[in-house]
Amino acid sequence: DYHYFSFEVDWIIIKTDAVFYIIHGDPGENGFLAEILEKNHIPQTGCDNYVSKLTFNKKKFIEFVDNLEIPCAKQILLKKKETIDIERILETIKPPCIVKPNNGGSSIGVSKVNYIDELEKKIKIAFNEDNQVLIETFLEGQEVSVGVIDRNGKRIILPITEIISENELFDYNAKYLGESQEITPANISKQSEELIHKYIAEIYDNIELNGITRSEFIIVNQIPH
């Protein structure tokens, strides 16, 4: 029974002692499993359901990060039940821009839009993956990824990795089909490295991230976003 994380063997109910979950996306990263485990007082690896829900929802997490005064791309949120109003979108964001599902991972449904006449088509592609779509200004710069391990209350920031995609953006093919290069340590300035460490510390301290996490930044003029 997934509601209680128990199962039956030879008429005996086996209860779960602890859960080490590595499920990518829904229902692992979005807080669904974490909430069930917490309600049943079952220890688990990773973040609690509140943190998982916050970080999985791109718009909510951007708002949280923006309140910490960490630079972010300008964005606008669309909902599937609403009419796609291209003129209203263009009042806030113009191509080049990125269109992505608001909830989800692995860059599925993510597109770069270079021209206005592509915008509606790319929005519909993203809506195939989620009921909410986020449109962001395109940031031209170095893309980097950094892992963090929280072990026994000690935060360990791993070396920063630079990501060089063979495609227009770090899309699904670049992530999983080898169409990218990953360089560790990243070829970035000391200023950028220090800012990334600072931003990670601020995020960790304000939402109590724990376990193993990975954050991605795009560095524009030495400033990570």
Annotated model-derived regions:
Residues 30-32, 108-109, 145, 216:
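Short glycine-/acidic-enriched loop or helix-start segments at secondary-structure transitions
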Residues 1-50, 55-56, 60, 79-88:
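ATP-binding N-terminal substructure of ATP-dependent carboxylate-amine bond-forming enzymes
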Residues 25, 107, 163:
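Glycine-rich phosphate/pyrophosphate-binding beta-alpha loops
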Residues 114-198, 218-225:
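Phosphate-binding site of ATP-dependent enzymes
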Residues 204-225:
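Conserved metal-phosphate-binding beta-hairpin within the catalytic cores
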Residues 9-14, 52-142, 197:
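Active-site nucleotide/adenylate-binding loops and adjacent lid/helix of ATP-dependent enzymes
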